[in-house]
């Protein structure tokens, strides 16, 4: 089941708005992220998102050039590390505070535009 990033953001906001849920889910999410291991490869979470959708392609095209360059560099570095069966040293690995959602605003904007376009394409005019 493919979910839109909008629904994921709404679910995250719902969880974070409730203190009890937030106290339960946040530590679990932090443990899951730590065990995922992508930070030890030099990647940020947004680098792992599926690129082969039109919405993601639009979002990636809208990234500023320095963000796009650093994203490509992180992905190439991770590929090289995977080929050599190595991990980055702890001081070069991505820290949790550096793992920001740099791509999410662009994805949300592209999803909103795609939704509006779909609505306009399917509009029915009643006579």
Curated annotation (Swiss-Prot):
- Cite the InterPro entries for this sequence: QCR7, QCR7_sf
**Domain of life from the UniProt record:** Eukaryota
**Statement: the UniProt record of this protein carries the keyword Transport:** yes
Gene inactivation phenotype reads: Reduces recruitment of inflammatory cells and attenuates the virulence of C.albicans infection in vivo. Leads to mitochondrial dysfunction and shows defects in biofilm formation or the maintenance of filamentous growth. Leads to decreased vegetative growth on several carbon sources including maltose, citrate and acetate.
Q: Which compartment or compartments is the protein found in?
A: Mitochondrion inner membrane
Q: Does the keyword Transport apply?
A: yes
Q: Which GO terms describe its biological process?
A: mitochondrial electron transport, ubiquinol to cytochrome c; mitochondrial respiratory chain complex III assembly; regulation of filamentous growth
Induction entry: Expression is repressed by HAP43.
> Main location per UniProt?
mitochondrion
Family (UniProt): Belongs to the UQCRB/QCR7 family.
* Quaternary structure and interacting proteins, as annotated: Component of the ubiquinol-cytochrome c oxidoreductase (cytochrome b-c1 complex, complex III, CIII), a multisubunit enzyme composed of 10 subunits. The complex is composed of 3 respiratory subunits cytochrome b (COB), cytochrome c1 (CYT1) and Rieske protein (RIP1), 2 core protein subunits COR1 and QCR2, and 5 low-molecular weight protein subunits QCR6, QCR7, QCR8, QCR9 and QCR10.
Please identify the protein, giving its name as recorded: Cytochrome b-c1 complex subunit 7, mitochondrial
Q: Which gene encodes it?
A: QCR7
């Amino acid at each position: 089941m493919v979910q839109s990033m909008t629904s994921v953001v709404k679910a995250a906001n719902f969880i974070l708005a409730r203190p009890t849920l937030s106290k339960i889910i946040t530590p679990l999410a932090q443990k899951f992220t730590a065990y995922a291991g992508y930070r030890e490869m030099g990647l940020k979470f947004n680098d792992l998102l599926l690129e082969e959708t039109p919405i993601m392609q639009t979002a990636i095209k809208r990234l500023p050039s320095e963000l796009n360059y650093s994203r490509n560099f992180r992905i190439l570095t991770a590929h090289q590390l995977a080929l050599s069966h190595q991990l980055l040293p702890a001081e070069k690995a991505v820290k949790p505070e550096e793992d920001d959602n740099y791509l999410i605003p662009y994805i949300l904007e592209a999803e909103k535009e795609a939704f509006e376009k779909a609505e306009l394409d399917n509009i029915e005019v009643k006579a």
